Amino acid sequence: MDKLDLVNDGLDIIDFIQKNQKEIQKTYGRSSIQQPSTKDRTRAWEDFLQSTSGEHEQAEGGMPKNDGGTEGRNVEDLSSVTSSDGTIGQRVSNTRAWAEDPDDIQLDPMVTDVVYHDHGGECTGHGPSSSPERGWSYHMSGTHDGNVRAVPDTKVLPNAPKTTVPEEVREIDLIGLEDKFASAGLNPAAVPFVPKNQSTPTEEPPVIPEYYYGSGRRGDLSKSPPRGNVNLDSIKIYTSDDEDENQLEYEDEFAKSSSEVVIDTTPEDNDSINQEEVVGDPSDQGLEHPFPLGKFPEKEETPDVRRKDSLMQDSCKRGGVPKRLPMLSEEFECSGSDDPIIQELEREGSHPGGSLRLREPPQSSGNSRNQPDRQLKTGDAASPGGVQRPGTPMPKSRIMPIKKGAQTRSLNMLGRKTCLGRRVVQPGMFADYPPTKKARVLLRRMSN
């Protein structure tokens, strides 16, 4: 084939491409090796079998019919360049006479990059992933050196960007790849995973009461509470289950005393409380108690003071320590603090710190009578006090349930009765009513 035939073939190919630009798939400048059609391959295989069929036939005497000659072969049908016009054999290849047979033209050729281990297409230089920063090129390149890559990238594509990372850099300096990962579309602010030793549990810091109850200064009401939504999720639950050596003073008061809570009652709730349990000293109704919570001086008992709890009185007469149901981890007290809800209630004259009472356990049966139970008085002189035993149902108006994931609530929605006494939320129970004594005992046993 001379040069003139090659030029004519090139012109024919150019004319065909210009006429069929929409049907031909673009190869981005790379050569596509097209396979012959199925019809051409079938015909060539049949011709080969026919040409070689008489070659191995043997006669009865065991001698072959042909002594290895090629008379049975059809040399003209073989795929060899025999003519001078560029055709291959008698069949027309897909490189010549394009429009003769539609099977000869492969409109969607399969293009394969001649690159070893093309990770994310960083070595192609073409297409949407032409940039070497795309994909995982910095992370993946260079990790399969050795037995996998027979030919290095520098020999296959000498113009390819060198993105391999040395082994010592890969093992030691991983922080230096942050900028490269950021350009690859990853999260540059991601926190790296640091495996922790699970065999040695981390010791939690001791609980500070100010985190739960504020600073505890009940008299400091100069600061106005913030007018806005109060996120109830920020209120942490006071726990008293774990008894370590570094327990706090606030928790020790509950551990050594009867954790009973006295709530103020309004006249609408007086019907639900036994009148025998009503405590009242009319001379002290309007006084503010000058002593801290749970700490009282020694004082002789006046004859007109009534016992607020018959069980407490009987146990003290017998000389024993009164039975007490320990507080659950789901209970917490609304004592006086800098909490905006508590301060709002203190302004209204019904702050829960004045309605909460702790009893000191009697030292012996002798001085148990000389040390009566006392109650912190509130500014509301008209409201009598009532005993709220542990585990007894409370009025529904007294409870503000704290649900996990609860929405924020405005201060304007909170009434006078909200947050009085204790707020109880038990797991697995509805928050619209407090648990019974049986449920408290069962939950306490399960927690232990």
UniProtKB/Swiss-Prot annotation:
Where is there biased composition of kind Acidic residues? Answer: 240-252
Residue ranges with Polar residues bias: 28-37, 77-96
> Which Gene3D superfamilies does the record match to this protein?
6.10.250.2490
Region (Disordered), start-end ranges: 26-104, 193-406
Query: Which GO CC annotations does the UniProt entry carry?
Result: host cell nucleus
Q: Which is a GO BP term held by this UniProt record?
A: response to leptomycin B
Q: Provide the alphabetized UniProt keywords.
A: Phosphoprotein
Question: Any other comment in the entry?
Answer: The P/V/C gene has two overlapping open reading frames. One encodes the P/V/W proteins and the other the C protein.
Q: What is this protein called?
A: Protein W
Gene name per UniProt: P/V/C
